């Protein structure tokens, strides 16, 4: 397995710890994180950390289950199900993620998904 693919596997696994410092350490200082159905993009490590803190804070559990992952040089893409517990609700969200890697860190992350399951929370 390539280092870039392993980096993303480790990043995905880190989410289950809900440890924001561990998760944010995977990013470059100038990284960009975009949840495609949401605005705006999170630009820079500080903005990404703020978003992740808010997300992790509202979740009682987080698990990302990767079904398929492909690698093309510095690009890693995966199809996964994000299993998230928020209050009494459990969400299983199908996601397509694209990661760009630079110098052993994530420099760009784009997730594509349907907001429907979150809208159902009320």
Question: How would you describe each model-predicted region?
Answer:
Residues 20-73:
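A solvent-exposed, acidic/Ser-Thr-rich amphipathic alpha-helical stretch
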Residues 78-86:
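Short beta-strand segments that buttress and anchor functional surface loops
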Residues 52, 64-70, 81-82, 94-100:
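Hydrophobic/aromatic beta-strand elements that line small-molecule binding cavities or substrate pockets
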Residues 11, 23-24, 31, 44, ...:
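Hydrophobic pocket/interface hotspot
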Residues 1-29, 120:
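Short, low-complexity N-terminal intrinsically disordered segments enriched in polar/charged residues
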Residues 94-120:
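Short beta-strand edge/turn micro-motifs at domain boundaries
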């Amino acid at each position: 397995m390539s280092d870039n693919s392993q980096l993303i596997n480790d990043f995905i696994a880190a989410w289950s710890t809900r440890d924001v410092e561990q998760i944010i350490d995977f990013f470059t200082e100038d990284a960009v994180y975009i949840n495609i159905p949401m605005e705006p993009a999170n630009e820079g490590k500080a903005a990404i950390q703020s978003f992740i803190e808010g997300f992790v804070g509202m979740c009682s559990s987080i698990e990302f289950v990767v079904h398929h992952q492909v690698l093309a040089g510095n690009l890693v893409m995966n199809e996964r199900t994000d299993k998230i517990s928020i209050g009494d609700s459990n969400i299983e969200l199908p996601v397509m993620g694209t990661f760009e890697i630079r110098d052993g860190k994530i420099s760009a992350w784009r997730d594509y998904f349907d907001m429907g399951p979150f809208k159902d929370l009320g």
